[in-house]
Amino acid sequence: MVLKQRANYLGFLIVFFTAFLVEAVPIKRQSNSTVDSLPPLIPSRTSAPSSSPSTTDPEAPAMSRNGPLPSDVETKYGMALNATSYPDSVVQAMSIDGGIRAATSQEINELTYYTTLSANSYCRTVIPGATWDCIHCDATEDLKIIKTWSTLIYDTNAMVARGDSEKTIYIVFRGSSSIRNWIADLTFVPVSYPPVSGTKVHKGFLDSYGEVQNELVATVLDQFKQYPSYKVAVTGHSLGGATALLCALDLYQREEGLSSSNLFLYTQGQPRVGDPAFANYVVSTGIPYRRTVNERDIVPHLPPAAFGFLHAGEEYWITDNSPETVQVCTSDLETSDCSNSIVPFTSVLDHLSYFGINTGLCT
């Protein structure tokens, strides 16, 4: 059954990547997603740094070094959909050598927990059902689900939960598991990021977050007002990781009480969200940002860096088909190391499992 689900999901993903050239029709946000009732932006937290990243295409060295893909490998934007073999340079890159530190067991346990939260969000019993009734739910059943969202246009799914033993307010965004989600994914159209002048982000991701922004921010800030000593952690897989990033920034920009000391961001298999100026702004906030990539997962390499997009956040790269083998690229902006070292030999299948947990399927 699981193999059948994986095959169906793989087929759908291939259709999705084939459809990338189709431009989505602009869709108006729902009336309850306006920003009218949101707290005002804090001017001192919405200024882009004057400096620019020194590297804007960190994938270029590996694209040149690893050579062209075999002619029989299906590709999109120069990346393999499912390369099954790769040159020695890629094998070497996936070893733990090379001066990049290994993640500690404590870090791996932490990342696994947030991956479990993200994976559980794919279960309808959790979102919108608001009950911990799923295969991995025993790991999160002590959390109280405050509210869930499942919107009509982009099918944005999210929840706010509270862990009293951990003293943490959790915000979890589901990734793509429906055609409507892929509509949000399939355009690479950059648009101005309204809070920060001079920066641009992926239009679909911005619109997806906009569908839940108003109510979600109000819910989180209400919880934070009741529990001001709690930290706030935002997480999501795939598209959910992209919206998680926008959410974390939104909270930082509107709530003085949230800062780098109590606001945290964890993503898994997250696509690139914005341009280099946006990535530089993300770094300037100081928000601890742990971005996990599984082996040769293609999604973190989209939209391509060559298209003017760049990741922020420390990269935690799962290698050698082992959840216990995780490299950490400690740079706040992505570099040519870690997962960028293996392009263009990427894979859709590696998007479906993180730390041995099925992501994208409620299994």
Curated annotation (Swiss-Prot):
Residues 25-94 form a propeptide. It catalyses: a triacylglycerol + H2O = a diacylglycerol + a fatty acid + H(+). InterPro entries: AB_hydrolase_fold, Fungal_lipase-type, Sec_MonoDiacylglyc_Lipase. Disulfide bonds join C123-C362, C134-C137, C329-C338. Transmembrane segments: none annotated. The active site is at S238 (nucleophile), D297 (charge relay system), H351 (charge relay system). Keywords: Calcium, Disulfide bond, Hydrolase, Lipid degradation, Lipid metabolism, Metal-binding, Signal, Zymogen. Its EC number is 3.1.1.3. It is an enzyme of class 3 (hydrolase). GO terms for biological process: lipid catabolic process. One of its GO terms (molecular function) is metal ion binding. Residues 1-24 form the signal peptide. Residues 33-69 are annotated as: Disordered. Ca(2+) binds at D350. Residues 43-62 have a biased composition (Low complexity). Belongs to the AB hydrolase superfamily. Lipase family. This is Lipase. It comes from Rhizomucor miehei. The lineage of its organism: Eukaryota, Fungi, Fungi incertae sedis, Mucoromycota, Mucoromycotina.
